[in-house]
């Protein structure tokens, strides 16, 4: 049998070699995720699997969008993603270049994976990569840095962010030697760097992220730390800080920016200014904070965002209640209407510093002194009238107290005289009403009697017990009460003069009384009470009826005295002849009744 040279063994096919590489890479990635350092070392040293081999791995992407997908990853990337510090330390020690290798699909580095993973050991993995020379400025295929992929509201977020900002971090992981001298860096503003401070609170979580804290405490309360730290990371205010805010609950100011502060950075009014000083006072004001949606919505990366990121985070603000709570409230008396404010309280409210800070007064000019005096006078008049109405309503009926009133008036001292409420109801002194009765039955031109009656009214009103007591009970002095009463007395004088003029035009009115009737003064004087004295402690509606009965006395003078008083003389019926002879005059009297009723009513 012939024998020839032995043929060499057939080399493995490229397809088989590719499949073996894929299997080895998948095994290495699984071991890196499980942080099995011994198995990884055996695969690398015995099976000669390269640490730089990449395989497909299902996980987060470095594109900035919260999505999962199949991406090519190395062992260092997977170890950084899951916080496998044992495998990661072995990889960066055996191959330091793996700390800065970028993925072929999305351009992610192990530092991107450590930031996006949010693992429990993410902080330790970040330190290992930074110590191995990983670049914090490396960009992914989407143009994002590692700090842009940090998940929000996690325990490791702040610590990793501080590590990425630390000045000890090398800006580049692959320093290349060059023959030419390095070009000087472009001039930048000097920014003071602070060492990482884990004691500072997280501005995006817990109490410091609530609306109540941001509106009323953020950059309002002073900081208690006695050492130098980063003011931008601290929610409290520091001496000389531009972000200082006034407490909206202590200072009354709006969310409108101050024009003077915007121009020069200062305001002459200081804390007394009614406008917002700075961006924080403007946008963190309770009337504006989170009343609009943020344009970035849930993808917003700002530390302190003034806007709402979801529709349910929007705050509903009532414009009339914004200066809520910021204006002093003035309570009116229980028995007075809403416009019957107390004079002292109303004046104090108008003169208080918080008065011009209301939304209406910020947009309108202040009231003039003349308008203010007029408003105060009207408030005093309304209050005084309401108080007197309440007083009259609570008084006993005259029919029930005629006997008691007769005894009381006989024994009472002048200091306890019956109050005079005639200023309220459009009438005056009781003697005036009796004289008015007599005037309706006498000659029309008796002016001196009315003049003396008006003098009595002017003398009586300032010394009335009600007016004198108003100084202490209702907050009115004698001068104000006299001014109010004088206007009513002048109006009544004009009305009484019209009564006299109308009576002068009725010649038949003078013939209605007989001589016997005229000579009986008790018939005219005791129409209000049995003892001939007026009792003014009556109800408001009863006094109104008495006034109306006085105006209609013309109607009943021919029959009332004869019917009620038996001791009077026989009536003179000669008035019938006058009515028959002068029909026009009688018609004139009856025509005057509706006019008198309208005048009194």
Swiss-Prot record:
It comes from Oryza sativa subsp. japonica (Rice). SUPFAM superfamilies: Ankyrin repeat. Disulfide bonds: none annotated. ANK repeats lie at residues 71-101, 106-138. This is Zinc finger CCCH domain-containing protein 33. InterPro entries: Ankyrin_rpt, Ankyrin_rpt-contain_sf, Unkempt-like, Znf_CCCH. It comes from the Eukaryota. A zinc finger (C3H1-type) spans 252-280, 288-312. Keywords: ANK repeat, DNA-binding, Metal-binding, Repeat, Zinc, Zinc-finger. Residues 167-180 have a biased composition (Low complexity). PROSITE patterns: ANK_REP_REGION, ANK_REPEAT, ZF_C3H1. Residues 167-203 are annotated as: Disordered. GO terms for biological process: regulation of gene expression.
């Amino acid at each position: 049998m012939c024998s020839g040279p032995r043929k060499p063994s057939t080399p493995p096919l490229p397809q088989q070699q590719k499949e073996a590489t894929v299997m080895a890479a998948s095994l290495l990635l699984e071991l890196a995720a499980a942080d099995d350092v011994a198995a990884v070392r055996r695969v690398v040293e015995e099976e000669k699997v390269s640490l730089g081999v990449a395989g497909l791995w299902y996980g987060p992407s470095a594109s900035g969008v919260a999505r999962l997908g199949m991406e090519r990853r190395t062992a260092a990337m997977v170890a950084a993603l899951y916080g496998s510090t044992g495998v990661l330390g072995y990889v960066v020690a055996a191959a330091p270049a793996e700390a800065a290798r970028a993925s072929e699909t999305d351009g992610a580095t192990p530092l991107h994976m450590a930031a996006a993973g949010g693992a429990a050991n993410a902080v330790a993995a970040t330190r290992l990569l930074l110590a191995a020379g990983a670049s914090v400025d490396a960009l992914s295929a989407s143009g994002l840095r590692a700090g842009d992929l940090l998940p929000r509201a996690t325990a490791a977020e702040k610590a990793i962010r501080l590590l990425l900002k630390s000045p000890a971090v090398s800006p580049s992981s692959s320093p290349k030697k060059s023959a030419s001298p390095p070009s000087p860096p472009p001039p930048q503003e000097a920014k003071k760097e602070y060492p990482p401070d884990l004691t500072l609170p997280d501005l995006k979580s817990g109490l410091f992220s609530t609306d109540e804290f941001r509106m009323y405490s953020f950059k309002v309360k002073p900081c208690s730390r006695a050492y130098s730290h980063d003011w931008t990371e601290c929610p409290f205010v520091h001496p000389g800080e531009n972000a200082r805010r006034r407490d909206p609950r202590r200072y009354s100011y709006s969310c409108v920016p101050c024009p003077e502060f915007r121009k020069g950075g200062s305001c002459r009014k200081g804390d007394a200014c009614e406008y917002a000083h700075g961006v924080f006072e403007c946008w963190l004001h309770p009337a504006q904070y989170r009343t609009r949606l943020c344009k970035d919505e849930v993808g917003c990366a700002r530390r302190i965002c003034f806007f709402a990121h979801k529709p349910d985070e929007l705050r509903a603000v009532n414009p009339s209640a914004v200066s809520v709570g910021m204006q002093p409230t003035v309570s009116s008396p229980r028995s007075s209407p809403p416009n019957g404010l107390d004079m002292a309280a109303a004046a104090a409210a108008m003169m208080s510093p918080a008065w011009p800070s209301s939304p209406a007064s910020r947009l309108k000019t202040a009231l003039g002194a003349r308008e203010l005096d007029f408003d105060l006078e009207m408030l005093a008049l309304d209050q005084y009238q309401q108080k007197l109405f309440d007083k009259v309503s609570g008084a006993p009926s005259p029919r029930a107290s005629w006997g008691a009133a007769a005894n009381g008036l006989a024994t009472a001292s002048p200091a306890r005289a019956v109050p005079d409420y005639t200023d309220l109801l459009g009438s005056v002194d009781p003697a005036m009403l009796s004289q008015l009765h007599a005037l309706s039955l006498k000659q029309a031109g008796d002016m001196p009697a009315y003049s003396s009656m008006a003098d009595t009214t002017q003398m009586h009103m300032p010394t009335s017990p009600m007016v004198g007591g108003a100084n202490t009970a209702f907050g009115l002095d004698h001068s104000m009460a006299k001014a109010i009463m004088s206007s009513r007395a002048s109006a009544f004088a004009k009305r009484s003069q019209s009564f006299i003029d109308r009576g002068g035009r009725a010649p038949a009115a003078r013939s209605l009384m007989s001589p016997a009737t005229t000579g009986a003064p008790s018939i005219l004087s005791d129409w209000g009470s049995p003892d001939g004295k007026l009792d003014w402690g009556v109800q408001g509606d009863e006094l109104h009826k008495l006034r109306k009965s006085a105006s209609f006395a013309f109607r009943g003078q021919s029959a009332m005295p004869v019917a009620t008083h038996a001791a009077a003389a026989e009536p003179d019926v000669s008035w019938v002849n006058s009515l028959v002879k002068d029909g026009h005059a009688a018609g004139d009297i009856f025509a005057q009744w509706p006019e008198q009723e309208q005048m009194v009513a």
